[in-house]
């Protein structure tokens, strides 16, 4: 996997992965929270 041993520990893939995870996770948590709130408001 790591052929070059002089490769730095901090590589751009980590930042792209962090961005993708937060772009998907934050609206999902907000959406689930909104649905849960709707269940309590309706009743």
UniProtKB/Swiss-Prot annotation:
It is a single-pass membrane protein. Keywords: Electron transport, Heme, Iron, Membrane, Metal-binding, Photosynthesis, Photosystem II, Thylakoid, Transmembrane, Transmembrane helix, Transport. One of its GO terms (cellular component) is plasma membrane-derived thylakoid membrane. Its cofactor is heme b. GO terms for molecular function: electron transfer activity; heme binding; iron ion binding. With its partner (PsbE) binds heme. PSII binds additional chlorophylls, carotenoids and specific lipids. SUPFAM superfamilies: Cytochrome b559 subunits. It comes from the Bacteria. It holds the Pfam family Cytochrom_B559. Heme binds at residue 22. InterPro entries: PSII_cyt_b559_bsu, PSII_cyt_b559_CS, PSII_cyt_b559_N. The chain crosses the membrane at residues 18-34. One of its GO terms (biological process) is photosynthetic electron transport chain. It is found in: Cellular thylakoid membrane. Belongs to the PsbE/PsbF family. This b-type cytochrome is tightly associated with the reaction center of photosystem II (PSII). PSII is a light-driven water:plastoquinone oxidoreductase that uses light energy to abstract electrons from H(2)O, generating O(2) and a proton gradient subsequently used for ATP formation. It consists of a core antenna complex that captures photons, and an electron transfer chain that converts photonic excitation into a charge separation. Heterodimer of an alpha subunit and a beta subunit. PSII is composed of 1 copy each of membrane proteins PsbA, PsbB, PsbC, PsbD, PsbE, PsbF, PsbH, PsbI, PsbJ, PsbK, PsbL, PsbM, PsbT, PsbX, PsbY, PsbZ, Psb30/Ycf12, peripheral proteins PsbO, CyanoQ (PsbQ), PsbU, PsbV and a large number of cofactors. It forms dimeric complexes. NCBIfam families: cyt_b559_beta. This is Cytochrome b559 subunit beta. It comes from Synechococcus sp. (strain JA-2-3B'a(2-13)).
């Amino acid at each position: 996997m790591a052929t070059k041993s002089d490769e730095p520990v901090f590589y751009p893939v980590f930042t792209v992965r962090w961005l993708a995870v937060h772009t998907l996770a934050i609206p999902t948590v907000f959406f689930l929270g909104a649905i849960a709130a709707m269940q309590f408001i309706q009743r």
